[in-house]
Amino acid sequence: METDCNPMELSGVSGFEEEAELNGFEGTDMKDMRLEAEAVVNDVLFAVNTMFVSKTLRCADDVAYINVETRERNRYCLELTEAGLRVVGYAFDQVDDHLQTPYHETVYSLLDTLSPAYREAFGNALLQRLEALKREGQS
Protein backbone atom coordinates (compact mmCIF):
# COMPACT_ATOMS: atom_id res chain seq x y z
CA MET A 1 0.00 0.00 0.00
CA GLU A 2 1.43 3.36 -1.01
CA THR A 3 0.79 6.59 0.80
CA ASP A 4 1.64 10.10 -0.17
CA CYS A 5 3.81 11.84 2.34
CA ASN A 6 4.17 15.56 2.68
CA PRO A 7 7.56 16.38 4.26
CA MET A 8 6.01 19.42 5.94
CA GLU A 9 3.70 17.12 7.91
CA LEU A 10 6.68 15.19 9.30
CA SER A 11 8.34 18.16 10.93
CA GLY A 12 6.39 17.73 14.16
CA VAL A 13 5.93 13.97 14.10
CA SER A 14 9.01 13.13 16.10
CA GLY A 15 8.65 15.86 18.67
CA PHE A 16 11.29 14.04 20.70
CA GLU A 17 13.20 17.18 21.60
CA GLU A 18 10.11 18.98 22.82
CA GLU A 19 8.81 15.89 24.60
CA ALA A 20 12.16 15.33 26.31
CA GLU A 21 12.16 18.91 27.58
CA LEU A 22 8.60 18.60 28.87
CA ASN A 23 9.42 15.40 30.73
CA GLY A 24 12.49 16.91 32.37
CA PHE A 25 15.03 14.78 30.52
CA GLU A 26 16.98 17.62 28.94
CA GLY A 27 20.51 17.50 30.35
CA THR A 28 19.26 14.70 32.54
CA ASP A 29 20.57 14.46 36.09
CA MET A 30 18.26 11.55 36.87
CA LYS A 31 19.90 8.72 38.72
CA ASP A 32 19.43 5.16 37.65
CA MET A 33 18.75 3.55 41.01
CA ARG A 34 19.84 0.14 39.75
CA LEU A 35 23.33 1.53 39.15
CA GLU A 36 23.26 3.22 42.54
CA ALA A 37 22.20 -0.06 44.13
CA GLU A 38 25.06 -1.94 42.44
CA ALA A 39 27.50 0.62 43.84
CA VAL A 40 26.02 0.19 47.32
CA VAL A 41 26.43 -3.58 47.08
CA ASN A 42 30.04 -3.30 45.91
CA ASP A 43 30.88 -0.94 48.79
CA VAL A 44 29.92 -3.27 51.63
CA LEU A 45 29.89 -6.78 50.19
CA PHE A 46 33.06 -7.60 52.14
CA ALA A 47 31.26 -7.12 55.47
CA VAL A 48 28.05 -9.15 54.94
CA ASN A 49 27.32 -12.77 54.03
CA THR A 50 25.57 -11.92 50.78
CA MET A 51 24.15 -8.84 49.12
CA PHE A 52 22.67 -8.32 45.66
CA VAL A 53 20.24 -6.16 43.73
CA SER A 54 16.88 -7.90 43.49
CA LYS A 55 16.10 -9.46 40.13
CA THR A 56 12.52 -10.17 41.21
CA LEU A 57 11.38 -6.75 42.42
CA ARG A 58 11.15 -4.14 39.70
CA CYS A 59 13.76 -1.39 39.77
CA ALA A 60 12.97 2.00 38.30
CA ASP A 61 14.68 5.34 37.89
CA ASP A 62 13.57 6.29 41.39
CA VAL A 63 13.71 3.00 43.34
CA ALA A 64 15.75 -0.18 43.59
CA TYR A 65 15.64 -3.13 45.97
CA ILE A 66 18.63 -4.81 47.55
CA ASN A 67 18.66 -8.15 49.35
CA VAL A 68 21.18 -8.54 52.16
CA GLU A 69 22.07 -11.30 54.59
CA THR A 70 24.14 -10.10 57.53
CA ARG A 71 26.88 -12.13 59.16
CA GLU A 72 24.35 -12.93 61.88
CA ARG A 73 22.33 -14.67 59.12
CA ASN A 74 19.46 -12.17 59.27
CA ARG A 75 17.89 -11.42 55.90
CA TYR A 76 16.50 -8.09 54.80
CA CYS A 77 15.04 -6.49 51.72
CA LEU A 78 16.18 -2.88 51.42
CA GLU A 79 14.61 -0.09 49.42
CA LEU A 80 16.92 2.50 47.86
CA THR A 81 15.42 5.85 46.85
CA GLU A 82 16.53 9.47 46.76
CA ALA A 83 15.46 9.61 50.44
CA GLY A 84 18.02 6.94 51.34
CA LEU A 85 17.90 3.28 52.33
CA ARG A 86 15.41 1.53 54.56
CA VAL A 87 14.32 -1.97 55.48
CA VAL A 88 11.08 -2.93 53.72
CA GLY A 89 11.06 -6.66 54.45
CA TYR A 90 12.62 -9.38 56.57
CA ALA A 91 13.20 -11.86 53.74
CA PHE A 92 14.72 -11.61 50.28
CA ASP A 93 12.43 -9.96 47.70
CA GLN A 94 9.76 -9.23 50.31
CA VAL A 95 8.15 -5.80 50.61
CA ASP A 96 5.82 -5.27 53.56
CA ASP A 97 3.83 -2.12 52.75
CA HIS A 98 2.82 -1.76 56.40
CA LEU A 99 6.40 -1.71 57.67
CA GLN A 100 7.42 1.77 58.83
CA THR A 101 11.20 1.88 59.16
CA PRO A 102 13.43 4.95 59.14
CA TYR A 103 15.49 6.00 56.16
CA HIS A 104 19.27 6.02 56.45
CA GLU A 105 21.42 8.34 54.36
CA THR A 106 24.08 5.68 53.85
CA VAL A 107 24.30 1.91 53.68
CA TYR A 108 26.97 2.13 56.39
CA SER A 109 24.53 3.74 58.81
CA LEU A 110 21.81 1.22 58.00
CA LEU A 111 24.05 -1.83 58.41
CA ASP A 112 25.58 -0.35 61.56
CA THR A 113 22.13 -0.46 63.18
CA LEU A 114 21.31 -3.97 61.89
CA SER A 115 24.55 -5.89 62.33
CA PRO A 116 27.19 -5.75 65.08
CA ALA A 117 29.29 -8.13 62.94
CA TYR A 118 29.16 -5.61 60.08
CA ARG A 119 30.38 -2.91 62.44
CA GLU A 120 33.29 -5.13 63.51
CA ALA A 121 34.19 -6.14 59.92
CA PHE A 122 34.06 -2.52 58.77
CA GLY A 123 36.24 -1.40 61.69
CA ASN A 124 38.77 -4.16 61.00
CA ALA A 125 38.92 -3.29 57.29
CA LEU A 126 39.45 0.37 58.15
CA LEU A 127 42.22 -0.49 60.61
CA GLN A 128 43.97 -2.71 58.05
CA ARG A 129 43.80 0.05 55.45
CA LEU A 130 45.22 2.62 57.87
CA GLU A 131 48.06 0.25 58.82
CA ALA A 132 48.82 -0.32 55.11
CA LEU A 133 48.94 3.44 54.51
CA LYS A 134 51.25 3.86 57.50
CA ARG A 135 53.60 1.17 56.13
CA GLU A 136 53.58 2.84 52.71
CA GLY A 137 54.44 6.16 54.33
CA GLN A 138 57.40 4.62 56.15
CA SER A 139 58.85 3.07 52.99
Curated annotation (Swiss-Prot):
Biological process, per Gene Ontology: intrinsic apoptotic signaling pathway in response to oxidative stress; negative regulation of protein kinase activity; positive regulation of canonical Wnt signaling pathway; regulation of Wnt signaling pathway
Name by which UniProt lists this protein: GSK3B-interacting protein
Major localization listed first in the record, in broad terms: cytoplasm
Post-translational modification: Phosphorylated by GSK3B.
Subunit organization: Forms a complex composed of PRKAR2A or PRKAR2B, GSK3B and GSKIP through GSKIP interaction; facilitates PKA-induced phosphorylation of GSK3B leading to GSK3B inactivation; recruits DNM1L through GSK3B for PKA-mediated phosphorylation of DNM1L; promotes beta-catenin degradation through GSK3B-induced phosphorylation of beta-catenin; stabilizes beta-catenin and enhances Wnt-induced signaling through PKA-induced phosphorylation of beta-catenin. Interacts with GSK3B; induces GSK3B-mediated phosphorylation of GSKIP and inhibits GSK3B kinase activity.
Example of a GO cellular component annotation carried by this entry: nucleus
Function: A-kinase anchoring protein for GSK3B and PKA that regulates or facilitates their kinase activity towards their targets. The ternary complex enhances Wnt-induced signaling by facilitating the GSK3B- and PKA-induced phosphorylation of beta-catenin leading to beta-catenin degradation and stabilization respectively. Upon cAMP activation, the ternary complex contributes to neuroprotection against oxidative stress-induced apoptosis by facilitating the PKA-induced phosphorylation of DML1 and PKA-induced inactivation of GSK3B.
InterPro entries (alphabetical): GSKIP (IPR037395), GSKIP_dom (IPR007967), GSKIP_dom_sf (IPR023231)
Region listing for Required for PRKAR2A interaction, in residue ranges: 41-45
Keywords linked to the UniProt accession: Cytoplasm, Nucleus
Protein source organism: Bos taurus (Bovine)
Family statement: Belongs to the GSKIP family.
Marked site positions, Required for GSK3B interaction: 130
Residue ranges, annotated region (Interaction with GSK3B and acts as a GSK3B inhibitor): 115-139
PANTHER family linked: GSK3B-INTERACTING PROTEIN (PTHR12490:SF4)
Localization annotation: Cytoplasm; Nucleus
Gene Ontology MF: a single term: kinase regulator activity
